[in-house]
Amino acid sequence: MQRDCVSPTKLENRIKKIVHKPFFKIALFSTTSMTVLGSVVIAPSLPALQSHFQNIAGIDFLSKLVLTLPALFVMLFSPLSGYLLDRYGRIKFLFPAMAIWSLSGFSGFFLDNIYLILVSRAIFGIATAFVMTGATALVGDYYLGEDRQKALGLQGFATAVGSAVFISLGGYLSSIDWRYPFLAYLLGIAIAIFAYTKLFEPHRKKTKKTHKEVEGSNQKFNFLMFLPVYLLVFFCMVAYYISPTQIPFFIVHNLGKNGDIVGISMSASSIAYGVFSLFYNRFRNIWSIYGIYALGLFLMGTCFLLLYVFHNYLIVMVSLMFLGAGGGLLIVNSSSYLLSIAPEMQRAKALGFFASAIFLGQFFSPLMTQPIVDRMSILGLFLIFTCLLYMLGLFFIFKSRMKKNFRKLQS
């Protein structure tokens, strides 16, 4: 009863103090980082997994599907998760999803059937949809304005640091046995318990009027307004996911390195992703949305240009840092822009489709890139994506210039 009597201003001030506490941020951003760990942690074990199931027909494709199948189910269930989270709240779905995420991910450790592993990865993807949408929606609920831009940068940094640590660990564990990286998913249980003690349901009015507003906002959801962001994110994730789906094979087969080296290489990308995400707010204070898009695309394009021209391990490390830097800017920039234009009562729904675009890109990445590798070799793949990313970057430079000229004419 006492809580209901608190004025909105006092309540908002109290919430603002809570959400800026260090342990609260650790709980929140650990939760958001879980979704990325879901894929990268097992990437170094793919060559060994493929060898283990070498007698299975189509294992070349199925082994990559172990990594990307969750993305398909995230794509399918993220819009539903967004609707449910907007309608009924965030927390009641988030914590059960985190538990399912951990258990279904861990099951790959003891399953010895590639098809059962794929089933477990599908369940894992459904849980990921709720965790990713719920956690990112909480960031949008807890923080506003510049605080939100900083929070999104911290989210990207926490995700990347966790990714770097666990993909390195995954690379080391995969050098022992391909099953061991699946043990890392048990960390989700510890994160869920810690988050349960810190996170809370954001203050939302629960009057009949609000429920009608929610129903109206659901009917008026303007998908086309967000579509350009979704398409751009989809393409960027197709390009970004060349790293875990194709480059491990390039390192092992073309450069003759071991699985533990693959993990270290992937972690270089994650570290750069985190650093550039962390400083996103500073980039945003200098450059426009279009300018940051152009920078991110040029950085990613430079990665594939270096891989195409130079064929040694040091260049792979440097190029993956370019890829991570560009990917970090692009995803955080898109998240920030999306949260700034999405109405409050449609925030989770907009983020649900955003998650769908991200994971749809992850799922389609090997489907779109493997035929190019088969026909033109992996070097041909690098050249094609160099050209595509540079051309798209030039497009955003043109858009940025046009916008500046339009403002000058208005003034």
Protein language model features and the residues they cover:
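Conserved MFS/SLC helix-loop-helix module at the cytosolic interface between two early adjacent transmembrane helices
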Residues: 75-113
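Helix-loop-helix hairpin linking two adjacent transmembrane segments in secondary transporters
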Residues: 145, 154-200
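Helix-to-loop junctions at the C-terminal end of transmembrane segments
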Residues: 77-89, 276-288, 373
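Extracytoplasmic gate region of multi-pass secondary transporters
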Residues: 226-267
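Cytoplasmic helix-loop-helix junction between adjacent transmembrane helices
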Residues: 114, 120-159
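Extracellular/periplasmic helix-loop-helix junction of adjacent transmembrane segments
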Residues: 46-75
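Central cavity-lining transmembrane alpha-helices of secondary-active solute carriers
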Residues: 65-82, 267-279
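Paired small-residue
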Residues: 100, 104, 115-123, 314-322
